[in-house]
Amino acid sequence: MSVSENILENASRVFGELRRQAWQKPAARPAHKPANPCQDLAGRHLGNPVAMRADFNMAVSAHRNVVSEFHNCWARRIFAILGAAALCACSAMKLGYQQGDHLAYWWIDNYVDVSTAQEPLTREAIARFFAWHRKAQLPEIASLLQQAKADVRQPVTPATVEHFQDASQQLARKSFEQAMPDLADLLLTLTPEQIGRMEKRFAEGNAKYRKKFLNPDPAEREDARYDKVMDYARLVYGSFSSDQEKAIRARMGPVVQNAEARYAERVARQQEWLRMVRYVHATQPPKAQVMDVLRRFREYWQNPPAKHAASHEASINAGIALTVAIANMTTPQQKAHAQDRFQKWIDDTHALIREKANAPVQSAATN
């Protein structure tokens, strides 16, 4: 699976929220419920645990945001924060990570309206995940960024892109396993009202997705996808010439043509997630069984069923081809810009590793 399109779509708004959090106090809210500055983001698919779908892979250029494809109700939001921060500015990566626990909680609350009883356990789970991730995965991320910095000066091949895909998939799987016990605990406590709220958020996000990416006007549809691709490309390589932009647009066809199939796969994942959540609510199985169900869902989104497999593979291949084309048309100056960008991300990652290096890491597996 390639870079999550929802991360890029919302990166500027997320970064705006990060800056607002850094400099402003939230509006007063009732004492029993924390302020939620992310409510205006309700319904968008950034926080959707099953809406993630990609059609463009800037694996070498943006390093896939390393873990931006991760799907679940806690860790996925954390990675969304990281991905959005990385897309906006180098220093924002640190800011996003440092405030990620708060934003992750707000996203979860936006989807399920966390109850008073659920709140302390949810916050503890998020803190536990961040402590683990800082120790276990940030060093791996720094290493992969270092590889990307070296590779970006060389001719890029599909194999290069696939290497970063595989590496980020492995990070995602490890993260899912780490968060799974806490996620199982949350699923066992969800009420019918919370599940209904989640379904409503999916529907709202899908409506926004259709409006932007499934516009009846082919030109509008292409423009929306092109803008997304160029946001990634400019972030990493800097500005592009008009000739380069025309060449990139000319290669957009396979990416745009698969839009309907991608949307169908997106909706199917959402429905599979909702079926799983309702099953857990109705049967209240032992925690170990809930974790087994979560693993099956993970396999579903990493290896979609046959009816979606062809479009899934086509999207991946289209993204790889476009990534390779963009990387190989860049000038020495653009490649130097990319190396500088990666180095700043590397520096920020190392700084984050040093922060709270001795933070305790606990597990919820036996809770």
Residue ranges and their predicted role:
Residues 88-89:
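C-terminal motif of bacterial Sec signal peptides marking the signal peptidase cleavage site
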Residues 93-193, 197, 201, 342-345:
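N-terminal Sec/ER secretory leader and immediately downstream segment
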Residues 12-15, 34-39, 43, 51-53, ...:
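N-terminal amphipathic/hydrophobic targeting modules at extreme N-termini
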Residues 60-79:
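Bacterial N-terminal signal peptides that target proteins for export
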Residues 181-305:
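Extended amphipathic alpha-helical interaction segments
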Residues 97, 112-120, 172-181, 191, ...:
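Short, low-complexity cationic-aromatic patches
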Residues 105-106, 266, 270-367:
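A cross-kingdom marker for long, charged
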